[in-house]
């Protein structure tokens, strides 16, 4: 019989213990499947027939007049377009059904993909451990920054900043006691006394665009299939149950809601999002934030990418670059790497109680909300014995660093194996592995990378490895063999990196390539957003997009270098006029004025003031979409006064005491 993860319905005491006896927590425990139109712009719903007509006309016109310019190696040239413009043809607010149940174990998934269950050589073992040492040594304390509007999740589900600071400060004080309880196997005590442990809270977020093609033979639009797991498949890790394509058919909306859906529009893709228990995350974040500061400073060449010019200066030194694509990064993330990281942290002298907290955070059960109507509200795994292998949970306090550690070394191993075996002699033991990796991350070797977790471009200078680099590129293009033992890696068709397109000229050489904004993203962000503007929420800090109008001010800086930027704006203007009988430019200028005024009022209440003229394009991007502070920019990239608008935290004095208790003396 296959191993089954224990599962507990909400009626079971195991699940009930995860939710405090307050209104928000009890509502979260029973949160039902919800769908409905979002407010794309103030007063304009995503299902408005005029808006759908506009998206229909615009997506067809742009695809017809500006076809993708991508060569057989996935490199973008010419007009800077990497794919068609049909991605906006979604009924925003209405998801595919069902979403996936998260796998309780990814061991079979990795085995089926022929991925290794540990380092395949002593060299690789040394490199993974060297990465831990370089990232987690010589850390300097920083304030513990907490995102405004975020939830503490299990068990209290509070959004109040004062409450979050209280939880964080208490967690730093009690972390050692909780960690020692976990070392004794007393996970229930650690949770009941200090709320450290419990489970991840799984919700489903919309991915408001997805791949859509037009079949030239039938004239029908086709949306990319998204495979989802049913409950049985999830609890057995794929040993039983079903994996099948979710339905994106939007025709159901007519019968259910009376919405007329134009031909070729689809329901949105949905992905799992896991909120971590904040009391457990806070002690992890207090270490993770100094790690980020260190690698974004010392290893900025590899890990910190600000302006396009900054990225171009790195790439222009290369003779070859390859944009990579990684399949299912979070669900493939290996548990053996967690064990290796924890082992090496102990070798370094990290406090065992903190390492146990960290390890537990990567093995927690998951409470699944509502993947479909009449489904969910179930706890997978036992909080008394956390042992799931779900991969990398998006709500873990150092999730970005875990992705960075895995993928940076995975990319390096791939480069060494296929292009630079002559460098292996420099990796003999831990000191030499650390020296080599330090040099590599600083961009001093003939093989290089710029990366942020699974988003990366690999590079080769004019050294001996270049010939092998071209062979690897051919291997990736053919797609017959996975070049990595650790993750499924291919080349990216339409090379993009952190939202920008690497645009080649006729020479197809990195030295003459430039980064330009992804024009598809510009359109999707405006007309197929993940979240509505929530105009009914008076407190801007509680909105998903507090100042969406500001995106208009930064649009030219962000996307203006794309060769067809002006043509696209003209097409938008014409199609908008056809649908609404008014100017889109005037509409957005008015929206910008209103949000600029609201911003000045909001920031005036903070410690410092700022006018629009003082804000950088990055500030404007982050204010329009604060999520970019999590995946694209860092605290150092954003003006201090704007950071105060979005974040608050625990003083450096308190985090310093905590960090000193955790790190080697």
Swiss-Prot record:
It is an enzyme of class 2 (transferase). Gene3D superfamilies: 3.30.70.1600, 6.20.410.10, Phage p2 RNA dependent RNA polymerase domain (1.10.490.60). Signal peptide: none annotated. It comes from the Viruses. Keywords: Magnesium, Manganese, Metal-binding, Nucleotide-binding, Nucleotidyltransferase, RNA-directed RNA polymerase, Transferase, Viral RNA replication, Virion. GO terms for biological process: DNA-templated transcription; viral RNA genome replication. It catalyses: RNA(n) + a ribonucleoside 5'-triphosphate = RNA(n+1) + diphosphate. This is RNA-directed RNA polymerase. It comes from Pseudomonas phage phi6 (Bacteriophage phi-6). The gene is P2.
């Amino acid at each position: 019989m296959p191993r089954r993860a224990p599962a507990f319905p909400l009626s079971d005491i195991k699940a009930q213990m995860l939710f405090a006896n307050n209104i928000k927590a009890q509502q979260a425990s029973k949160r039902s499947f919800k769908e409905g139109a979002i407010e794309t712009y103030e007063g304009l719903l995503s299902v408005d027939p005029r808006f759908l007509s506009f998206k229909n006309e615009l997506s067809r016109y742009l695809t017809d007049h500006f076809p993708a310019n991508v060569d057989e190696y996935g490199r973008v040239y010419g007009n800077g377009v990497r794919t068609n413009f049909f991605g906006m043809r979604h009924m925003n607010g209405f998801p595919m059904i069902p979403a996936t149940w998260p796998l309780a174990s990814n061991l079979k998934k990795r085995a089926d993909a022929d991925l290794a269950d540990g380092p395949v050589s002593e060299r690789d073992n040394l490199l993974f451990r060297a990465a831990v040492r370089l990232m987690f040594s010589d850390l300097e304390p920083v304030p513990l920054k907490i995102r405004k509007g975020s939830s503490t999740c299990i068990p209290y589900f509070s959004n109040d900043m004062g409450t979050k600071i209280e939880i964080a400060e208490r967690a730093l004080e009690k972390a050692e006691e909780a960690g020692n309880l976990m070392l004794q196997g007393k996970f229930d005590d650690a949770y009941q006394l200090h709320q450290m442990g419990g489970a991840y809270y799984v919700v489903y977020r919309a991915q408001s665009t997805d791949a859509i093609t037009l079949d030239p033979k039938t004239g029908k639009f086709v949306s990319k299939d998204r495979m989802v797991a049913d409950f049985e498949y999830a609890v057995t890790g794929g040993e039983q149950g079903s994996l099948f394509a979710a339905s994106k058919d939007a025709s159901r909306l007519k019968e259910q809601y009376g919405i007329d859906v134009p031909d070729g529009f689809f329901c949105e893709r949905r992905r799992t999002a896991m909120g971590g228990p904040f009391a457990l995350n806070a002690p992890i974040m207090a270490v993770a934030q100094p790690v980020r500061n260190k690698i974004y400073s010392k290893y900025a060449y590899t890990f910190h990418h600000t302006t396009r010019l900054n990225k171009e200066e790195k790439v222009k030194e290369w003779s070859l670059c390859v944009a990579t694509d990684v399949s299912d990064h979070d669900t493939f993330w290996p548990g053996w790497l967690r064990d290796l990281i924890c082992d090496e942290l102990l070798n370094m002298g990290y406090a065992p109680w903190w390492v146990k907290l960290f390890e537990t955070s990567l093995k927690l059960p998951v409470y699944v909300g509502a993947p479909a109507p009449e489904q969910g509200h179930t706890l997978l795994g036992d909080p008394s014995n956390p042992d799931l292998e779900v991969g990398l949970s998006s709500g873990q306090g150092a999730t970005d660093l875990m992705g960075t550690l895995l993928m940076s070394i995975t990319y390096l191993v791939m480069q060494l194996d296929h292009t630079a075996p002559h460098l292996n002699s420099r990796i003999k033991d831990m000191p030499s592995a650390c020296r080599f990796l330090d040099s590599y991350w600083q961009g001093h070797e003939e093989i290089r990378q710029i990366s942020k977790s699974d988003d990366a471009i690999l590079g080769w200078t004019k050294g001996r490895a270049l010939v092998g680099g071209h062979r690897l590129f051919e291997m990736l293009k053919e797609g017959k063999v996975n070049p990595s033992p650790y993750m499924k890696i291919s080349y990216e068709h339409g090379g993009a990196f952190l939202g920008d397109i690497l645009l080649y000229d006729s020479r197809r050489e990195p030295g003459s390539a430039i980064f330009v904004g992804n024009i598809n993203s510009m359109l999707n962000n405006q007309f197929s957003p993940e979240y509505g503007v929530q105009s009914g929420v008076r407190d801007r800090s509680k909105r998903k997009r507090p100042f969406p109008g500001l995106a208009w001010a930064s649009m030219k800086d962000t996307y203006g270098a794309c060769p067809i930027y002006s043509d696209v704006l003209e097409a938008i203007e014409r199609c908008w006029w056809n649908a609404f009988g008014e100017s889109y430019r005037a509409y957005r200028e008015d929206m910008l004025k209103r949000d600029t005024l609201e911003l000045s009022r909001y920031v005036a209440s903070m410690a410092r003031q700022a006018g629009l003229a003082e804000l950088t394009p990055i500030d404007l991007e982050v204010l329009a979409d604060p999520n970019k502070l999590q995946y694209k920019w860092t605290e150092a990239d954003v003006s201090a006064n704007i950071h105060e608008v979005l974040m608050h935290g625990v003083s450096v004095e308190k985090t310093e005491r905590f960090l000193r208790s955790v790190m080697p003396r």
